[in-house]
Amino acid sequence: MNPNAVWPRTAQSSLKKHQVSLCTCQRRSHYRLRSFSTFADRKIHQSAGFSSSSKNHDRLSHRAREKLLDREFFLSLLSSASTQREAKSYLARLKAQHQPDLPQKPTSAPASTAKIPPLPSGVNLGSFYGASRSVYETPVFRQGPTPTPRQDQPERLHLALVKLSIPQTLDDTIIDGVAKTLAQLDRLGLTCCVMIDPGAAEDARLLRTLATEQADRLAIAIHKQPDSKSLRLDSVLSVDPATPHLPKVLSRKALLKPLRDGHTVILTPIAYTEDVPRAVMVSADDAVLALTRELAGLATFPDPDEDPLTTAERIGRLQKEVSLDRVILLHPLGGIPAFNWRQSSHVFINMEQEYDDIENELLQARDVISAGDANLTASDILQHPSSVAVSNPLSKFVHKEIVPLPPARSLSPMVPEAQRSAVEGHLENLRLSQKALAMLPSASSGIITSPIEVANSAKTDQPSDLSVVGTRRQRNPLIHNLLTDKPLLSSSLPMSRRGPIISAQGILNPVTSHTTFVKRGMPLTILPNPWVKPWSAQRQPRLRLDDPSIDLPRLVHLIEDSFNRKLDVQDYLNRVNDRLAGLIIAGEYEGGAILTWELPPGVQDDGSAENSARMVPYLDKFAVLKRSQGAGGVADIVFNAMVRTCFPNGVCWRSRKNNPVNKWYFERSLGTWKLSDTNWTMFWTTPGLVEDSQKFRDYEAVCRSIQPSWAEDTGVVD
C-alpha cells in the first residue's frame, strides 16, 4: 500500500479518530469546507480549495502549510505564556491528562500442594487409615461471590463555557479572530461551549432569527480553522412557563456527546416550554447559569425516598464526568472598569473579598449618571468614592506610583443613556461571573474581556520587507490564562512598573489590559480592622499573636511550610507581641503577613510623639503555603492589602540577597538597598525615602538589627 496515497473523504474520515462533521448551517451554505486531520496525526490531509499540477508539489505544499500552521499555533502558545517554563509545564500537564491508565497485569495464585489433614487423635498414621491422595487432590468447586464488572470511566472532559454578546455588531475579522482562539483552546485540551447573546429587542421572532444567524456565522468561522469542528445545537434548553427565568438542560447526553467528539458547540438562548412545545427566548445569562448548573452536576433534584449516600454517589459521578474550568464572557465593553482614570479595568477580582464593594461602586456610578450628569467621566466617579475606591486592596493603585495619562487619552464623555447602558452591562457581567463561579470548584476561574482584544491577539504576523526590530506578539488573554491561571498583568504590580511598549513605528503604547480575571477566591482577614481604625504607631493596647481570634498553630504551620524552616515559637512571640502592628490572613491560612512597628536601636520606647514618629513599619513575615505559591493570586492579595490598605504610606522589609523571590519584591517596591557586611537586601514602598536621610538610616538600622527566631541552624547566613 502506498503510504503517500491521498484518500477520498469517506475513506479518510473512517481512519480518523475524530470525524469532521458539518454544522446545520453548513449543509446549506455556499462555503467550500475543508477536512482536517486531528492534532496528533496529520499524515493524511487534503484540502478542497487547494490544488496543484503535480502530486509531489501538492504534498510538499501541504507539508509547508502544515508547518506554517504549527508554527503559528506554537508562536501563539509561547507568546501567551509569561515564560517558556509555563508553556512547557502546561504541555506536560496536558500530556499527563491524556495518558491512559496502564492495565494491571493479572496475577495467578500459586498452586497449593495438597496436605493430608491429621487425624483427631493427633497421631500421624500415614495414609493407611486416611483417604487416598487422589481424594485430597480432587478439585472442589465452590460458588463464590460474582465480581462486579468494572465500568470504564470516560475521560474527564475539560470545558470552557463562553458567552459571546451581540456578535452582530462585530465584523468578520473579529469573528474570525475569536474563532481562531476558540480553535486553539480546543487544541490545548479545553473544549468550548458557546452561548450566543443577541441582546434585547422588542420582536422575539426577529431576535430568534438573529441569534440563529449569528450562531451559524460563528460555527462557519470555527469550522474554517485547522483541525476544528463546530456544531450548532437546537432544542437544548427547556423552561417552565411559571418560572421563565429558570431554564434547564433537556438532555445532558445530547449536550456532552458532540463536546466529547471534539466539536465546539454553539448554542442560542432559545428554550422550549414544557407544557406546549413552543420556542421562546430566554435571558442569555439565565441560559449560561442553567448550563453551569448542569455541567457542575448540580441540576439533579434528589428523590426524598432515595438513600442520601446513593444520591451523593450519583452526583459525584456526574461531577467526575466534566470539569468546567473557565467561564468566559466576551463583551464589547471588556473588563470591569476600576473607575480610576489611571487604569482601565480591574486586572483581578477576588469575589469573596471584592464583589460587594465593586458592585456598590458600579451602582453608585449608575446613580450618578441617572442624576443627569451628561459629561460623566471616570474621574467624576472618584469625586464620590465608595469604600472600594478608598480601601479595597485590589482596586486602587497607589496614586504616587502611577503615571497620569495624557489629556488625549482621557475618557471621552458619553451621553447619559449610553453611559447608563455601559454600567448596566458591567453590572450584568460581574453578577453573572459571581453566580457561575459560586457553583463551581475554587480551581475554576472566569475571564471578562472584549472580542476585539481576543481577535487582535490572534492576528497572524505579516512578514515585513523592512529590517526593523518588531515588538513581541500581543498575548492572548484566553490562552495566557489557560496556560498560567493568572491575569495578563499582576494585580500587585504598580503601573509605573508597566513600562510603555515601543512599536516598530516608534509609537508609544501604554501597557493596559481590558481583561478582568475573576476567581471565586478566598476571604481576606485583617486584624485589627483598618477600616474601623487605621493602624497607628501610637502606644495603645496592641494585638498579640496568642489572641483567641488568631489560630496560632495554623499560623506557625503557614510560616514553617513557606520558609521550610522550624520556628522557635516562644522566642518569636516574645519578640513581636509587644510591637505587633497587625496580621493579614488570606483564606484558611493559605497566605499571610505579620507586620510590626520597630524602633531603631538606641531609641527609647517611652510613648512620646517624637519617638513614636520614628517607628518603622516593618514586614516581619510574608508567607504563602507551598501548594498555593504561584497560583490563585494569594501572594498578590496579601501584598496589595499590605501596601494599599494597612500601610499606604509605605513599609519596609528585608530578604536574603540570594532569595529567588527578590525579583518579585523588586518589581513591587519603590527602592532597594543591599546592606553591606550582611546577607540582607532592604526593600521599601515608602515614597521619598531616599530624600529623608534620617528615616532612611532608621529603616536601615531596623533591617540590620532584627534577630531571626528559627529553632535550628540550617547553615543559612543571615
Swiss-Prot record:
Domain N-acetyltransferase: 539-708
Pathway: Amino-acid biosynthesis; L-arginine biosynthesis; N(2)-acetyl-L-ornithine from L-glutamate: step 1/4
Region (Disordered): 97-116
Keyword line: Acyltransferase, Amino-acid biosynthesis, Mitochondrion, Transferase, Transit peptide
Annotated organelle transit peptide span: 1-36
Record GO cellular component, one term: mitochondrial matrix
Location relative to the cell: Mitochondrion
Catalysis performed (reactions): L-glutamate + acetyl-CoA = N-acetyl-L-glutamate + CoA + H(+)
InterPro entries, per the entry: GlcNAc_Synth_fun, Vertebrate-like_GNAT_dom
EC number assigned by the record: 2.3.1.1
One MF annotation (Gene Ontology) recorded for this entry: L-glutamate N-acetyltransferase activity
Broad enzyme group: transferase
Biological process, per Gene Ontology: L-arginine biosynthetic process; ornithine biosynthetic process
Predominant location category: mitochondrion
Residues that span the membrane, as ranges: none
Function: N-acetylglutamate synthase involved in arginine biosynthesis.
Family to which this protein belongs: Belongs to the acetyltransferase family.
The protein's name: Amino-acid acetyltransferase, mitochondrial
Organism: Aspergillus clavatus (strain ATCC 1007 / CBS 513.65 / DSM 816 / NCTC 3887 / NRRL 1 / QM 1276 / 107)
